[in-house]
């Protein structure tokens, strides 16, 4: 890119900020590198505090332990949920996505870049593991355990499950405070099957005020039942990285008005991050705002399809997209970008991605696109209230 375009690009990215602070000056990829070095310097003290908790020197989940862990993680993540533990051999840092697949992507990136010096003493885990013993929650003077919950499963064609759950101890909560009852059950489900399987395979669940007809099973046996039905071993069930490479196809009704706006012409697409696409379509920005705080952005490269006129036009358009993805990935590197799918529209084709180093990715893409035989190409983030920038 020319010097003036570099300035224009940086000014464009600065305009994303609503607080006056440009988070992209310190991109996520750099935060991760520096963050792991900070973790290395402080991890011995964190291990000591975990051991103190195990030995009863400090209370379970004490403010002291939480503060020590946040001090090591906040240089990377402004908002992070985690658990710590010890499995008899190594200390464990468990990073949780709070039921949101979009949050898995930066957590997996962080996990993959853990230095070997950290991994000698720590297991860095993304997503809560199943609690195979009879986990229980004590609320309002009574214990509610997985053994108290019965479940009926209805499997769908896409290998996701709809659950119907009955717990006698929760019936009164269900009548008095339904949201609270569902919150408790979310916790129990995560402990029963693990966070990744819960996000990936449980489409929805319903709490019942009385048992359902037919044979049910205790919640303690749900994980094994899901494994058997899906034909997966434990590691496959809990593999968050593999889940982030799983794609979902979707169809939309396109707007034929060429002036309707970015992405309004899309009629079909595929994505590995459904929540991101859904939020954009619903004019929401929670995920994008959260990404921005950590020096991440997500968006699309779009290019005009008017120049593709051969008989195999559709294949040409998609082949061009695949080639563009490969060239950008080779030039920018996996450290800078993760591609998450794409979409086809009446007037444009779209290549979707998450950028861990946004400025580098856009500069690389502009350099590659300038030599392509297409009439128009631009970048647009998955914010409805932000403009795109022309790259060709």
Predicted regions and their residues:
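"Short basic amphipathic alpha-helical interaction patches in structured regions
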Residues: 107-112
């Amino acid at each position: 890119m020319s010097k003036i375009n570099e300035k224009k690009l940086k000014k464009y990215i600065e305009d994303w900020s609503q607080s006056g602070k440009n988070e992209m000056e310190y991109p996520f990829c750099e935060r991760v590198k520096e963050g792991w070095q900070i973790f290395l310097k402080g991890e011995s003290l964190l291990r000591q505090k975990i051991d103190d908790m195990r030995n009863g020197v400090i209370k379970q989940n004490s403010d002291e332990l939480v503060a020590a862990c946040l001090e090591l993680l906040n240089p990377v993540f402004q908002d992070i949920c985690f658990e710590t533990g010890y499995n008899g051999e190594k200390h464990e840092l468990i990073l949780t996505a709070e039921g949101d697949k979009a949050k898995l992507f930066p957590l997996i990136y962080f996990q993959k870049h853990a230095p070997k010096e950290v991994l000698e003493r720590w297991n860095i885990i993304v997503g809560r593991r199943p609690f195979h013993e009879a986990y229980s929650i004590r609320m309002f003077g009574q214990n509610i355990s997985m053994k108290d919950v019965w479940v009926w499963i209805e499997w769908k064609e896409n290998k996701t499950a709809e659950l119907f759950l009955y717990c006698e101890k929760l019936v009164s909560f269900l009548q008095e405070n339904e949201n609270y009852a569902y919150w408790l059950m979310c916790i129990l489900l995560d402990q029963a099957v693990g966070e990744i399987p819960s996000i990936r395979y449980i489409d929805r669940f319903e709490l019942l005020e009385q048992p359902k007809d037919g044979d049910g099973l205790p919640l303690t046996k749900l994980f094994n039942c899901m494994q058997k039905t899906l034909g997966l071993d434990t590691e496959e069930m809990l593999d968050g990285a593999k889940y982030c490479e799983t794609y979902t196809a979707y169809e939309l009704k396109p707007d034929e008005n060429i002036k309707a706006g970015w992405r309004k012409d899309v009629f079909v697409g595929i994505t590995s991050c459904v929540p991101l696409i859904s939020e954009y379509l619903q004019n929401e920005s929670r995920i994008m705002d959260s990404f921005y705080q950590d020096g991440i952005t997500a968006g699309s490269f779009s290019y005009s399809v008017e120049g593709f006129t051969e008989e195999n036009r559709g294949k040409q358009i998609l082949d061009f997209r695949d080639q563009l993805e490969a060239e950008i990935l080779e030039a920018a590197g996996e450290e800078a970008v993760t591609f998450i799918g794409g979409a086809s529209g009446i007037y444009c084709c779209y290549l979707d991605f998450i950028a861990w180093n946004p400025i580098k990715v856009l500069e690389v893409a502009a350099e590659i696109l300038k030599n392509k035989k297409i009439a128009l190409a631009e970048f647009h983030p998955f914010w409805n209230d932000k403009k795109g920038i022309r790259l060709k």
